[in-house]
Amino acid sequence: MVDSYDDSLDGEKSKTQVKRELHALVDLGERLTTLKADVLAKLPLTDALRKALAEAPKHTANIARKRHILFIGKLMRDQDQEAILVLLDQLDASTRQYNERFHNLERWRDRLIAGDDADLEKFVIEYPDADRQQLRSLIRQAQHEVARNKPPATSRKIFKYIRELDELQRGLR
């Protein structure tokens, strides 16, 4: 016997594919519940979805939270998911960029505390607004703290100073 192939199903999505897409919408909705209000304000969302997202933190019981997340997923069907995903990707990229800059400043602090005058010179070249005398004093204090196993209070001051210089150089201050 020969099975006949029906061409009418070619354009339709399978049940599994539809379920995957719905789960993706629920996951996206759950991700939206973790965002702050100022970020949500930038997203193109309907009023019903904004209201549901605002109510999400009120649902603390597991089953109630799960039911509310599924409701948000249902509301996500009426949204422009591509625009939301693009904005969330931009947010993730800016977060990664911020984290990378933060880690770079931490590396500078560690190099200055552990290093010698060559590292200080490199830092002053990269950040010409740096007060060399103040920085040397902070570095010396931090090195004394490390030698005496004290809490790194001066190390935090150095990081704060480096961050202020970085923000000044980037025009953020």
Curated annotation (Swiss-Prot):
Keywords: Cytoplasm, Ribosome biogenesis, RNA-binding, rRNA-binding. The keyword Transferase does not apply. One of its GO terms (cellular component) is cytosol. InterPro entries: DarP, DarP_sf. SUPFAM superfamilies: PSPTO4464-like. The keyword Nucleus does not apply. GO terms for biological process: assembly of large subunit precursor of preribosome. One of its GO terms (molecular function) is ribosome binding. HAMAP family: DarP. Member of a network of 50S ribosomal subunit biogenesis factors which assembles along the 30S-50S interface, preventing incorrect 23S rRNA structures from forming. Promotes peptidyl transferase center (PTC) maturation. NCBIfam families: PRK05255.1-1 (NF003593). Belongs to the DarP family. This is Dual-action ribosomal maturation protein DarP.
